[in-house]
Amino acid sequence: MGKAKVPASKRAPSSPVAKPGPVKTLTRKKNKKKKRFWKSKAREVSKKPASGPGAVVRPPKAPEDFSQNWKALQEWLLKQKSQAPEKPLVISQMGSKKKPKIIQQNKKETSPQVKGEEMPAGKDQEASRGSVPSGSKMDRRAPVPRTKASGTEHNKKGTKERTNGDIVPERGDIEHKKRKAKEAAPAPPTEEDIWFDDVDPADIEAAIGPEAAKIARKQLGQSEGSVSLSLVKEQAFGGLTRALALDCEMVGVGPKGEESMAARVSIVNQYGKCVYDKYVKPTEPVTDYRTAVSGIRPENLKQGEELEVVQKEVAEMLKGRILVGHALHNDLKVLFLDHPKKKIRDTQKYKPFKSQVKSGRPSLRLLSEKILGLQVQQAEHCSIQDAQAAMRLYVMVKKEWESMARDRRPLLTAPDHCSDDA
């Protein structure tokens, strides 16, 4: 059987047998249209504002953009002012290291507020970026209101901060002043500084000070309280001895306080040991206690002994013994007592002492300083110390004094009562 032939006019138009010329022209037209479309799209994109991170920010042009940005800035500033007093910062508690941390916290607090107030995309967004940057850019460019933290950020070390009108120096200034004060304070003297010899410690104390005097006394073998220690013989007999030293402290009675009355009576033995010490009740109203010299105060006499009792006790102790003292006629007078002339050893009347200190009526203070090398009666007098000093003077020249007393016994005359107290 033979195959039937299909007519050419009934073929599909899209068959590959179509003419090549017109097909090429169609594809070129389509390509041109595509190129035009993409070019127009690129132009539209270029006209739109850039939103990428590297996009150039342009200033706003429309007046509406200006007004919207101004409102956003005003609202942001009001919120900052309302939040500022909630957390007051104390300048004294802010160190130089803590200040940057506080500023960073303020930045973190402001950034979310600005983010919430971002303007819509497009021209409004362009305007907002031009005047008030949004997001992270706000932290860098926006004018942060001046707070205590930001104000003190620029302060450097050594500057002074002002709080309520008072200038508070920083720690560096205080440490510098303390260092200057320490450098200015003179160092106390040492043993190497006190190198000179044969100088009285009292003179050193007056010239240099008490610290230097202590060192000088230490070098001389003296210590504090050396006056009382040198006048008393340690580990010696503490009872009555052949010689006893007497001294009395007196107060003033009468209209002007010129008359004297016994207020304290002290007796020491030959070794400086105190064997008797009592306050005496006044028989008349005291008009002058003479505290600066006598050391007697009203409370001392309240618990005192009666004068008659003291008289009997002292007379019993002195009976048959050598009585030593300084200006003894005054002490015996206020006690209303008497003692044999040959048994009295008065340091004020001993001629070798007078010639040694070049004084016709030397005081006990002068004799102690020149002969014993001790300072007594510097302030308030003490009857025990005065009796010890008199006994010490007597013991130093006891042999010579007793030999002179034996030689002069046949030539003794009546006692001289005209001498006064030194």
UniProtKB/Swiss-Prot annotation:
It is found in: Nucleus, Nucleolus. SMART domains: EXOIII. One of its GO terms (cellular component) is nucleolus. There is a cross-link at K115 (Glycyl lysine isopeptide (Lys-Gly) (interchain with G-Cter in SUMO2)). Residues 1-194 are annotated as: Disordered. Residues 243-394 form the Exonuclease domain. Gene3D superfamilies: Ribonuclease H-like superfamily/Ribonuclease H (3.30.420.10). The modification Phosphoserine is found at S15, S96, S111. Residues 26-40 have a biased composition (Basic residues). Keywords: Exonuclease, Hydrolase, Isopeptide bond, Nuclease, Nucleus, Phosphoprotein, Ubl conjugation. Signal peptide: none annotated. It comes from the Eukaryota. Residues 106-127, 151-176 have a biased composition (Basic and acidic residues). Its EC number is 3.1.-.-. GO terms for biological process: DNA catabolic process; DNA repair; regulation of DNA-templated transcription; RNA processing; rRNA processing. One of its GO terms (molecular function) is double-stranded DNA binding. Can bind ESR1 and ESR2. This interaction is abrogated by estrogen and augmented by tamoxifen treatment. PANTHER family: RNA EXONUCLEASE 4, RNA EXONUCLEASE REXO1 / RECO3 FAMILY MEMBER-RELATED. Belongs to the REXO4 family. This is RNA exonuclease 4. The gene is REXO4.
